[in-house]
Amino acid sequence: MKLLDSLRFRIATLFRRSQMNAEMEDELRTHIQHRADDLERSGLPRVEAERSARIEFGSYSRVKEECNEAAGGTFVESVFQDLRFAFRMLRKSPGFTAVAVATLALAIGANAVVFAILNSLILRPLDVPQAQSLYGIERGKDKDVTESYPDYLDLRDRNRSFDDLAAYNVASVGIDTGNNPSGAWLLEVTGNYFDALAIQPYLGRFFHSADERGPNSAPYIVLTYAYWHAHFQDDRGVVGRVVQLNKHPFTILGVAPVEFRGTISFVFPDFWVPIVNQEQIEGTNWLNERGNRGLLMVLGHLKTGVTPAQAVSDLNSVGTYLEKTYPKDDGHMTFFLMRPGLTGDWLGGPMRAFLTGLMLLAGLILLAACANLGSLFAARASDRSREIALRLALGSRPMRILRQLFTEAVLISLIGGAVGLWGSIVLLRGLTVWRPLPTAPISLPVHADANVYGMALLLSLASGFLFGAVPVRQVLHTDPYQVIKSGSTGTLGRRITVRDLLLVVQIAICAVLVTSSLVAVRGLMRSLHSNFGFEPQNAMLVETALSMAGYSGDDALTMQKRMIDALKAIPGVQSVGSVDRLPLYYGANDSNVFTDKTSDLRPSNAVADAMMYKISPEYFDAAHTTLLAGRIFTWHDDKNSPRVAVINREFARKIFGSAAIAVGSYFKMRDGTRTQVVGIVEDGKYASLAEDPQPAMFLPVLQSPKSEMSLVVRSNRDPQQLAAAIKSTVQELDAGLPFTIRTWSRELESALFPSRMATLSLGVLGVMGAVLSITGIFGMAAYSVSKRLKELGIRMALGARPREVLHTALGRAFKLLAIGSAAGLLLGILASRVLAFIVYQATPRDPLVLGGVVLAMALLGLLAAWIPAQRALSVDPMILLREE
């Protein structure tokens, strides 16, 4: 009851403030009057009695303030007073306010952008019901995220921990809705996919397990909301319409809800089809291949009460069963759980490392901004030392002054945070619609949600309190009588030491960021000059899937040969070859490889997992891949000829021990087929620029037909002219075949996309750090010059040379620059392990990097000190002495 009574009283005081102030004024005056009456009765004159009573009473304003606080309503009123005072002070210093707000906006905006990406891709679960219980499955020591279809069926039917398990795979297809045929991306999914995720359609219905009755038995598609909106203009009559996928009829069953875009965070398909129709989509049937495990990703909801550890144990018992039952196909069947969305550790690991490292660097930017503003606030408090001393002498409490300083700091930080958040939202909208890889369904679904807003608010408040705390020591150790007596507006306490420390911290952070930026640039340059195993220059790519136009089997091979011959006939074309998957951009399929003497073809007995490509005879000529030994394929290496392969040098070393004995030797594939090595080519990069040398084998396409292919057209003609000739040539062969034409160099940019993004991100942070460093050094130098103008004038009047004047004015700033740069460079070198996760071939100990950092910091110092130096040298001693 006492608490409620107190609360009611405090609320009442907010609405009766004027009345209570009047009553308090009367009471205080009455108190002083009574004391004066007592003194007058003791013999003092009336005037002297009133004066003595006021002296005994003390500061009238302070007593009034204490009474108001005791009444409980002053706090809110004083907060508004502090806010009004802070706004007034900021309006009086528009330059300081603009610099402070811009500094914080850059720093908090950068942190908001990085955190929004981290939140969208890593922290936030998929947008499905009960997402916290949704897990994906990884397998084996390498934590592969894909399974074969038969293994998936066993996992689904034999586990006791999941409500259901669904599987999915990304594929491309040609679609004809009645207009011009075009390419599209889809997810091939099991019939229980939508049921397992517990989502409901926006329009129509989903397909279910009951719709699957064998291969090609469920010709249905479910559209994403975005595809329905873009291609069918929100036509609700689309349900039941028949469209052509690879010239096979499929019926539209429904439209998914607007918020659901699939189960891979960065891949947005156009629609979903049942996986049992995989042969119609991809032109081949791998559903019965138990050993073909590089295909399906699996996920499902844990049953209520089942822990992840229990689920892993349950899955491993199924894995033990599979190893015993199918020893030839299933090995290393140990399982792990992962959060779905980023395809497990294969992509999730590097992505988490990159974004975490980027978040740390963005945090350093914010720390540098706080150091910058802390230094400015210390200088600002120093310039207001006389004002603060007078207020203290007149009875103001130090805590009230500090509260006003903190209010000013927090107000600036909130304004800067709001501006930075607004800028980050604008940038995030651009990132959301940006397609980094135009030929792939990849985008960054980043949005500013409550987590981002909360993080921005938290960083704003923390920043305000952090740099607002810098002048605390100065205020608490101020001797008002000494300051007033000396008439100084200069030093307060030991502010120089604090400002020096803040500047060193700021410069050190800048040096770390500049080091990171230069390391990223050097890493990217090394990437661009790596030995890819092919030459992208002067080569065009024609990418298509013949299955999109209804070609399969021998018809697809015949059409591929016709396309190669027709393109070779174009004037200026030197060679044309095809490959089923481009190195780096699409990665490659891998296959277990066994020695020729091995009869036990279980995966555990494989001597290597080799990258596998299917190529036409002239691919190596078109790609400019160097043949080291043996021969390349011919069109006679068909399905009626002995199985042959061309391998790379690493394959020869790993399988045969030496390239000298590899040509003519045999090895076995996963299916037991004996394959003879007929040639050896140079090593290259196949799945990643960061990979160690990998074994790779190339098989003739006539012995292993593929519908999907990329034609490499090597020419000495202008790419734009050649593109027009290629387009007309392909359309003459089949006007209904979807295809794209790009330069190989442009396509390779997709493989370099992670390195480019890392370089760009670190470069932006490095520039921001440099800007903050310039402002910090400039502020330090300008403040030093302004406070020592009279001293500099006297020195010049006494004959000091310009160099001595500059040393006096700026020597301290450059010493701090040297200390901070050395500390930052050392920290940048020690951060090599972190940088290695962010940038390929990151080597901070590179002499060019070290020299570049030293040069960059020296240039930054000279740039920042230029204006203060000019001011110091332009001092007219006669004018200063006359003013004195």
What are these regions (language model features)?
Residues 1-102, 301, 336, 481-494, ...:
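Negatively charged linear elements and acidic catalytic determinants
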Residues 5, 185-209, 218-356, 429-433, ...:
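Mid-to-C-terminal secondary-structure elements
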Residues 54-99, 127-128, 140-145, 180-183, ...:
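Membrane-helix entry/capping segments
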Residues 67-98, 340-347, 376-403, 407, ...:
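Alpha-helical transmembrane segments of integral membrane proteins
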Residues 94-121, 125, 369-371, 417, ...:
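Short, strongly hydrophobic transmembrane alpha-helices
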Residues 116-117, 336, 374, 410-480, ...:
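Small-residue-rich transmembrane alpha-helices
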Residues 118-138, 267-284, 328, 337-346, ...:
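Short juxtamembrane loops and helix-capping segments at transmembrane helix boundaries
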Residues 369-413, 775-817, 821, 871, ...:
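Interfacial "coupling" helices/loops that link adjacent transmembrane helices in transporter permeases
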